[in-house]
Amino acid sequence: MEDLELEGSLKELFETPSLRWIFVGGKGGVGKTTTSCAVAAQLAKTRESVLIISTDPAHNISDAFTQKFSNTPTLVNGFDNLYAMEIDSRYQETFDFKMSNLPSAEAASFSLTSLLPEMLQAVPGIDEALSFAELMQNVQSMKYSVIVFDTAPTGHTLRLLAFPDLLERGLKKLSTFKDKIQSALQMLNAVSGQQIQEQDFAAKIENLKAVTTSVREAFQDPAHTTFVCVCIPEFLSVYETERLVQELAKQKIDCSNIVVNQVLFPVGGVQDEGCRPPASLLASADAETPAPLEELLAPPAARGEKETAQEENARLRQLIRRMQIRLLALEKSYHSRRAMQSRYLQQIQDLYSFDFHVVPIPQQPEEVRGIERLLRFGDLLSSCRPLPILPPAPSSP
């Protein structure tokens, strides 16, 4: 049976009611936040309650919705079922592994990583993994129909998704610190005036293991969790997308959708090969320097001077020529960028079109901010259009 390309839209994602967690990520500057906000707004049309969480320190969802958000869910203006929150720059303090179930306020101010600094050296990144664990434990307790994660650029996102494995290694490493744990608890007891037993500490560790296991299971359940990659048709973005796709496969996290943003489509439906200006005409346009546009637009009569019919005709010819040169320069830039994008669109099609929903989004004429524009962007995500790949150049005879 012949393989068929998957439909180029997010329609299937929007129509999957079992999805609870949708991560949106990619290289910085490709439109992750616009896409995640548009996805959340689109889901709000059919889901009972939707939450979008920004884990990106840049926190652009406030800019996208033109509304300030904090680290608690806030209703988005214009909706009755869409909420947003931004994990602030202190989230490692906010969500650090506090020993909050221990008996005193002084004890609660201690964290696992402050008690065992050696663990930070033995397992690099364990402090961030502990923060992610606490964050995801909070997320698991939230009663929203679906949660959309606007993630940080690729490297940070990969660390977040890999935290269950890292944390599991860290917890195994704890067994080698038994004597140090006992000493740390003695110090904590001396400071707090309480008697914290080793089994209290062990209970916290077991709870953390349970969180790690449940989050891993949720991450690896394609009916529960999926990842939407966002890229643009340029080298670095396509490279990072492939890196992200490979890592998601390694982590057994579903990824079935790739949004290709900022794509130039043929202008007015005209085929590219039929509207390319001749190279000789472009070269002559580059060489010409007509009179300044201001002079050509202002007739001498406006300055109290006389102009003969011959002078007027010459001025108008120069004005038309000046406009031609400007249009040719724009067209030259357009075709150059179309050709560059087409090469990477071809790569994207070859790599992903049979296993992923590849969704090309046209370059927008204005910044996508505010509910109305985000909803229009969401409609683009829901509709299908082919990748605008240029036909191969005719071979020379």
UniProtKB/Swiss-Prot annotation:
The entry describes its oligomerization and partners as: Homodimer.
**Protein name, as recorded:** ATPase ASNA1 homolog
Q: Which domain of life is it from?
A: Eukaryota
Q: Where in the cell is the protein located?
A: Cytoplasm; Endoplasmic reticulum
Q: What does the record give as EC number?
A: 3.6.-.-
Uppermost EC category? hydrolase
User: Which source organism does the UniProt entry give?
Assistant: Toxoplasma gondii (strain ATCC 50861 / VEG)
Provide any one GO MF term from the record: ATP binding
Q: Which CDD domains match?
A: ArsA
Q: Name one GO cellular component term.
A: GET complex
Where along the chain is ATP bound? Answer: K27, G28, G29, V30, G31, K32, T33, T34, E234, N261
